[in-house]
From Swiss-Prot:
It comes from Rhizobium etli (strain CIAT 652). Belongs to the bacterial ribosomal protein bL20 family. GO terms for cellular component: ribonucleoprotein complex; ribosome. The gene is rplT. This is Large ribosomal subunit protein bL20. InterPro entries: Ribosomal_bL20, RIBOSOMAL_L20_CS, Ribosomal_protein_bL20_C. The keyword Phosphoprotein does not apply. CDD domains: Ribosomal_L20 (cd07026).
């Protein structure tokens, strides 16, 4: 069996790592050892931050909804509770988008939530609420 030299493979691997390290500062973009460590770390950060990104967006949507709902005299928590009581299932991303781009439709949702909360306050139960979409 013929002897396999690893030079071509090693060179290809090094090129791949250095290409991934393009744009890094100092030795991290030139030397293979530093570049490999930096690329490995950057992949860990990317993995972690893909999860953090989802949390950040959810927090942003909640802040936007809260700001929009307060114009109608409700808090975010009361609004979400009212939507649940009314049987309206819309996620926070869509609610945030509606608050920005379709204020009339968002206002209708707020009024439905208010109505459900008032009905609950009057009767003490939300099970027989007429406006419920169940």
């Amino acid at each position: 069996m013929a002897r396999v030299k690893r030079g071509v493979t090693a060179h290809a691997k090094h090129k791949k790592v250095l290409k991934a390290a393009k744009g890094f500062y100092g030795r991290r973009k030139n030397t293979i050892r530093a570049a490999k460590a930096a690329v490995d770390r950057s992949k860990q950060y990317a993995y972690r931050d893909r999860k953090v990104n989802k949390r950040n967006f959810r927090a942003l949507w909640i802040q936007r909804i809260n700001a929009a709902v307060r114009e109608f005299g409700l808090t975010y928590g009361r609004f979400i509770d009212g939507l649940n009581k009314a049987g309206i299932e819309v996620d926070r991303k869509v609610l945030s988008d509606m608050a920005i781009h379709e204020p009339e439709a968002f206002g209708a949702l707020v009024n439905a939530a208010k109505k459900a909360l008032e009905y609950l306050k009057e009767t003490g139960t939300a099970n027989e609420f007429e406006g419920a979409v169940r």
